Amino acid sequence: MKIQLTQQIIINNKHRWYSMLDELCFKSKNLYNYALYQIRQYYKNTNKHLTYYELNALLAKKNQIDYRSLPYAQCSQQILRQIDKQYISFYNTLKSPKMKGKKIRLPKYKDKENGRNIVTYTNQCFKLKNNVLSLKINNNNKIDIDTDLNVQIVRIIHKGNHIVIELIYNKEYELKCDNKQYAAIDLGLNNLVTLTSNVCQSVIYDGKKLKNINHFYNKRKALLQSKLNGNKKTSNRIKRISYRRNNKIKDYMHKVSHLIVKYMKTNNLNTLFVGKNSGWKEGINMGKTNNQNFVAIPYNLLINMLDYKCKLFGIKMIILNEAYTSKCSFIDNEKICKHKTYYGKRIKRGLYESKHGHKLNADVNGSFNIMRLGIQKCNCDALNVVPTDKRYVYNPVRIKINI
């Protein structure tokens, strides 16, 4: 089996490549706006959609200047495909019963001066020889990137004060056989990840530093916004601290996901169950501070990182609905569903008490319940959900992440 991965190269605005890549993204924006105008006018006059194939033939025949300004015809065609997808999505939204009576906007033009658009190179548009990828930018310039990857697609994405070059490549992976050794994770705030297993020590990966990053960012952003003049919503300084904050969070998530996969590999755990609720950030009411922290933490980013890293090591990852896993008692083997009264309860913050008075970490209880759900769903014949050593249940190890 194959998995598609991406390697990113960050080009800041002082790099020697920045100006020519910026110009390339500007030309891409020009073609984007021109093609969008053609589709809008065609729809206005005929009430029909101008398809990608019709638009591509039209611009090629006219030898349109924006179409020809990009290094390769395939680069221009990728922009036309981008717009075509947006319009198909727009038409599908119009037909959706859920959107009836709601205002649906057409795809917008990009700003004439400050707008930039993505540039995509297929593997027909670059040379990869002796671990050097040569990328033509214009008639006079090219850039050489050292890489040992079998790159299939290159994307150049303008991000304001920096540009990202994405190298997209495929990698083979093979899932290991079920060895009846499982792990499950429960996601939270102070305890970002609580990992439990039926054969080894429970582990809690700290999330307090992640909260600190968000707290500092929100405080700093509010101060800078209070100094803005008129109707301005952002500034270069706000963009800069947002960029740094996003990079810190991404780095933190990479470190946590790496430690989880490394722990699973070391302990020969071949299956990971992840608890998640769809729409768990919508309409949530945990108080102002907790809402701010919970909504700001990108749990989906962590789950996606875990997904591809698990595949690279042959670990099977299964996402489950974690509803009622925190309320039901794992120790009492309580059925995981809604009850009028539950066997156990939280007696204080972070501490869960079972029916017979056993006390354990509340997140550990939730994580073990997620494992129970996973074993039931997959019809796994686990020897035992509870580890033989009870210290693995009652004494989880806390791991702090260095940033």
Question: Predicted segments — roles?
Answer:
Residues 35, 75-90, 362-374:
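Stable alpha-helical structural segments in soluble proteins, enriched in small hydrophobic residues
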Residues 53-159, 292, 296:
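Acidic carboxylate diad motif detector
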Residues 28, 80-87, 238-246:
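Short amphipathic alpha-helical coiled-coil/interface segments
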Residues 36-43, 87, 91-98, 171:
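Long, hydrophobic, amphipathic alpha-helical segments used as structural scaffolds
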Residues 1-76:
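Gly/serine-rich nucleotide phosphate-binding loop at the start of the catalytic core
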